[in-house]
């Protein structure tokens, strides 16, 4: 696996820009030449990188490994631009709350944050964030050919847009895929399922195999980013729609009820005990420990699953796209960490923020940071935002968990995503909480799926009318 240290990171970005580092440089020019060459990938762009030199921006991020990488390589941006970048690091839920408080108060403490795309409609409705077209179309701020926005995964861009306008850029993302233990499949003579019904049948056949492994696991923990990160894929795969053409809420429609019945039946009968309290870390750890035969969740789990020091499933795992639902659709969960510009910032800080977002989401930074080792336990990023990187031989070699892993993820991201997989409306935070409660109530048999969704539908109707 290709791995990059801090020095190697700088060398790699130079090579991406078309210049190899040269050792035979006259001493009087050494510092200048080194500076020029390590920034070559960026100096090739027709951008005035130092136009707001001396500005300082603060960014709110989560403690995830990909943001550790971004923070570790950000000194290169500071040297390139003369812009000081500082970070506050807090967990996702608290981060969203803090960002909303900052937006609402207009204090502009944070220039940008690693946001949830589902909140962009709320931000846009309150004019808390800037549309990015003016920045992208400004030739002093952006070299459109160099930046090549069209290389970014299209449906992540769609998810970061509101009413057709782009309000954020994806810095990191993921797709949900089917992850399964090949050895257990072979033991039972099973083939990877083509449909969700076949998936449930494999869960039944694999359940308690060798006396312990659960047949399958999905997120059961209550939350808009937990159980409601998975069930919407089932809802749409069953042919569901959140709203009718007349705006009527449709979560208690037949596809809603049937997909929730499926989810409950699968986990109640073939899932692990206590799955209603499981989020992705519990699922990943159980699978790695041999206690779950298969699951559907983020492709990023592969970095841990394929680490022999942490996983019994390393080298024994298969990856495939979601099986098709009754409607014939595969619908993956769509996610990216969306970086927007705080509208309350003064103009120079807005420009400084855009320069950072552009730098971070550019191909050179995405590729080099993906391979950068910020600590001895660091793993390669599996959520780069560029199609060209997913097809890059260096990157594909680094994530060669199985011969088809990269193709499975890239195809999923290109073909199985729907930006409206969850409703992108300002009321989303309320919808997310109501639906998460309903789904868990059905899972733990407090209510039938029909009753849970009828009640959720009525509650959502009330606040959607306001």
Pin down the residues of each PLM region:
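Extracytoplasmic/periplasmic solute-binding protein
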Residues: 157-171, 176, 200-249, 255, ...
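N-terminal export signals
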Residues: 2, 8-32
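Glycine-centered hinge/linker elements that transmit conformational signals in sensory
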Residues: 202-205, 246-277, 318, 322
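Conserved C-terminal helix/tail region of periplasmic/extracytoplasmic solute-binding proteins
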Residues: 39-43, 50-52, 56, 84, ...
């Amino acid at each position: 696996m290709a791995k990059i240290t801090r020095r190697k990171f700088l060398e790699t970005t130079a090579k991406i820009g078309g210049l190899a580092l040269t050792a035979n440089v006259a001493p009087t020019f050494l510092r200048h030449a080194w500076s020029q060459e390590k920034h070559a990938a960026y100096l090739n762009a027709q951008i005035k990188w130092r136009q707001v030199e001396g500005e300082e921006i603060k960014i709110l991020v989560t403690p995830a490994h990909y943001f550790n990488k971004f923070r570790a390589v950000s000194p290169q941006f500071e040297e390139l631009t003369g812009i000081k970048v500082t970070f506050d690091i807090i967990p996702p839920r608290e981060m969203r709350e803090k960002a909303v408080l900052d937006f609402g108060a207009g204090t502009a403490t944070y220039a940008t944050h690693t946001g949830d795309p589902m909140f962009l409609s709320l931000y846009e409705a309150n004019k808390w964030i800037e549309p990015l077209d003016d920045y992208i179309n400004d030739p002093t701020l952006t070299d459109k050919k160099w930046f090549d926005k069209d290389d970014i995964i299209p449906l992540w861009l769609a998810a970061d847009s509101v009413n057709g306008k782009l309000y954020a850029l994806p810095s990191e993302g993921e797709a949900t895929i089917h992850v399964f233990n090949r050895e257990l499949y072979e033991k039972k003579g099973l083939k990877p399922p083509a449909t969700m019904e076949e998936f449930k049948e494999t869960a039944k056949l694999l359940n308690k195999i060798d006396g312990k492994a659960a047949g399958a696991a999905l997120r059961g923990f209550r939350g808009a980013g937990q159980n409601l990160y998975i069930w919407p894929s089932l809802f749409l795969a069953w042919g569901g729609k959140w709203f009718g053409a007349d705006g009527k809420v449709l979560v208690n429609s037949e596809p809603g009820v049937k997909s929730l019945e499926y989810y409950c039946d699968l986990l109640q009968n073939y899932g692990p005990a206590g799955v209603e309290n499981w989020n992705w870390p519990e699922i990943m750890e159980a699978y790695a420990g041999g206690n779950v035969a298969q699951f559907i969740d983020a492709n990023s789990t592969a970095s841990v699953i394929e680490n022999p020091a942490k996983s019994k499933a390393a080298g024994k795992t298969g990856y495939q796209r979601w099986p098709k639902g009754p409607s014939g659709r595969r619908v993956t969960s769509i996610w990216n960490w969306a970086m927007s510009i705080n509208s309350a910032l003064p103009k120079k800080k807005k420009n400084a923020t855009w320069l950072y977002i552009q730098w971070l989401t550019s191909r050179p930074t995405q590729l080099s940071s993906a391979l950068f080792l910020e600590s001895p336990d660091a793993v390669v990023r599996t959520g780069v935002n560029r199609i060209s990187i997913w097809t890059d031989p260096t990157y594909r070699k680094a994530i060669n968990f199985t011969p088809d892993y990269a193709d499975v993820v890239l195809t999923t991201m290109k073909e199985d995503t729907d930006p409206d997989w969850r409703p992108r409306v300002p009321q989303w935070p309320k919808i997310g909480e109501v639906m998460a409660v309903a789904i868990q109530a059905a899972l733990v048999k407090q209510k039938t799926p029909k009753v849970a969704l009828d009640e959720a539908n009525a509650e959502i109707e009330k606040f959607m009318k306001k």
